[in-house]
């Protein structure tokens, strides 16, 4: 069975997170295999989500700000590269909305990569997924937690149930040279400060990026914005911590 919420319930579940537990209890059963939102079917897999998260997907609540900006500024003429694509939720919705010329995702977490590949295949989307992280080209330790959300390049603090694995990284300059993107979509949990230098964005016209003041403070956010400005970009819109930069 595939869950598809009525419009009113979608609105409630999207804007009032506390209601998702109630909806999960109402809709979830052993027969549920997926949910559907905006013509995209999301498989229900316990390895990466519970009932509440599936309801959030069915309501369009996950990564809503990033997706809204991408839909507004990206077009079918773009070659899109996404760093930190996670479960592929934003990638799928953006891909469905704009049908870009080409679409490449980079994600470190092997569990997330497996889910996103299943998601893209189920919805017949031509999106390439690369299990590498944005970095300096070296290999980096990654802590894969039993709870997908707690996985990190840092040792998880809220669980003891994880395993350490090695993940290859790739530099921004190498990605730009190989994929020739016109648009970058990025959410890498603070690593953007070190590994997404605007000076390496030759040929890139649009950057939608989530900044993380909890990692480097408000002064760090301002420093990153100034680096974009110095390298020919202008900030055109912000939704919460997600910023859109366009080349002048």
Please describe what each predicted stretch is.
Residues 1-248:
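Phosphate/nucleotide-binding beta-alpha loop and adjacent structural elements of enzyme active sites
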